């Protein structure tokens, strides 16, 4: 059994789910799966994937897990009570082979009852694929690479650089994920505990994975994902105001907690048009998840300065396909100018070699419809969108004044 706890997912699933319970309990949604690697054959493993999903749907939250969620100040008691009754239902998810060897995964049902599928299902697809295609995983190489990354992070002048694990969805396996996290905690240190230096804070800020945050005593991290702002396209008063609507509902729910705004659902230009002085003061910062991170950071800092908001009081979070090398480059460019956070995913949890011997799966599950209408993101990177309704995409670009990609 790959997934053994419903906490084995990202924190932002719970923070979004709480908003859904309180603000949008009747919303109906649809999600679709996509593997971006050309030629990857997942169809032979459909029965195995279905079996793992069946096991996932048998899980319930344990009392200790509910107590852990309840200990977070932004999680409300009625939401924890709801989770105490919660189970994922197999009737809302289908897995089917496609002629070319690919697979279709469709999740359709009430948003409140389907939101927790995405992360564990992606982790299942990954682990099933790799345990069938790599019978003898190159763990020695994975450990060597992890050692090299830690050495880079512990170089002189980087003592204040902190990284976080965002790698649940694309991990090689659950066991490897846990090993990586235990090594990072021991070698980099957490919070005020510096592991391998005489003094100073640790360099491991925490993990997006709630189960391992609980098990290892580190900070669980996350706020919102694209699906939240995409759903607001269908749930808000009018399309042009949907991003503002999403941020306002979020602020109403969390009253200053979880103040990181996601910036790339409509691209950075549209984000900055909506992210006015009110939101700049209300939110703690923003997260970059597509496009050029260096240009993004400079634009956001300039935006803060223009509105006379002190950038030093704001946090820039980088989380788009980060490597340790790229993280260090970003840290050197922005340190001292603002608060910084870095979420590293696949590069931490699925780096056991180089292609063709080992290549991580670029798998995603994205919301494509809400309340019967298409929803989409117009990210700052081509190829990151999932919407197949060209008319809706054209309309979205027009409404948010975004030029079509060449």
Swiss-Prot record:
The keyword Lyase does not apply. Signal peptide: none annotated. InterPro entries: N/Namide_PRibTrfase (IPR041525), NAPRTase_N (IPR040727), Nic_PRibTrfase (IPR006406), Nic_PRibTrfase-Fam (IPR007229), Nicotinate_pribotase-like_C (IPR036068). Pathway: Cofactor biosynthesis; NAD(+) biosynthesis; nicotinate D-ribonucleotide from nicotinate: step 1/1. One of its GO terms (biological process) is NAD biosynthetic process via the salvage pathway. Transmembrane segments: none annotated. Its EC number is 6.3.4.21. Transiently phosphorylated on a His residue during the reaction cycle. Phosphorylation strongly increases the affinity for substrates and increases the rate of nicotinate D-ribonucleotide production. Dephosphorylation regenerates the low-affinity form of the enzyme, leading to product release. The modification Phosphohistidine is found at residue 226. It catalyses: nicotinate + 5-phospho-alpha-D-ribose 1-diphosphate + ATP + H2O = nicotinate beta-D-ribonucleotide + ADP + phosphate + diphosphate. Pfam families: NAPRTase, NAPRTase_N. SUPFAM superfamilies: Nicotinate/Quinolinate PRTase C-terminal domain-like, Nicotinate/Quinolinate PRTase N-terminal domain-like. One of its GO terms (molecular function) is nicotinate phosphoribosyltransferase activity. It comes from the Bacteria. Keywords: Ligase, Phosphoprotein, Pyridine nucleotide biosynthesis. GO terms for cellular component: cytosol. Belongs to the NAPRTase family. NCBIfam families: NAPRTase (TIGR01514), PRK05321.1 (NF003704). Catalyzes the synthesis of beta-nicotinate D-ribonucleotide from nicotinate and 5-phospho-D-ribose 1-phosphate at the expense of ATP. This is Nicotinate phosphoribosyltransferase. It comes from Verminephrobacter eiseniae (strain EF01-2).
